[in-house]
């Protein structure tokens, strides 16, 4: 089943914003234990997916403190991001994080296939 969350990040997050986002992610890791698997390796990123042992994984969700600056192709909109979750259980964690970030950063636009 196709189901995707979308967002536009037009700028880098400030230190204050990023600290709030990371704090919320710590909360999500706690309440979604067994649903999401944290794959974060760098302090300036949040990376997670669903639990592959339960076949609850799909595309990995990645949020970066610093926006991407190098295009992969000429017409690429560097602000545009998406994560296909196929409505698997970790979709709630993805959407929660996007809604939280949108609340913290009003210029962070979000939408989904719903």
Q: What positions do the PLM features span?
A:
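Acidic (Asp/Glu-rich) sequence patches and key acidic residues
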Residues: 1-114
């Amino acid at each position: 089943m196709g189901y995707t969350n979308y967002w536009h990040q037009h700028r880098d997050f400030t230190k204050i914003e990023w600290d709030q986002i990371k704090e919320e992610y710590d909360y999500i890791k706690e309440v979604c234990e067994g649903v999401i698997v944290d794959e974060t390796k760098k302090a300036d990123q949040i990376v997670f997916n669903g639990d592959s042992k339960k076949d609850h994984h799909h595309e990995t969700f990645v949020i970066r403190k610093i926006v991407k600056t190098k295009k992969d192709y000429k017409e690429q909109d560097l602000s545009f991001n998406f994560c296909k979750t196929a409505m698997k259980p970790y979709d709630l964690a993805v959407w929660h994080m996007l809604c939280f970030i949108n609340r913290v950063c009003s210029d962070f636009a979000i939408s989904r296939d719903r």
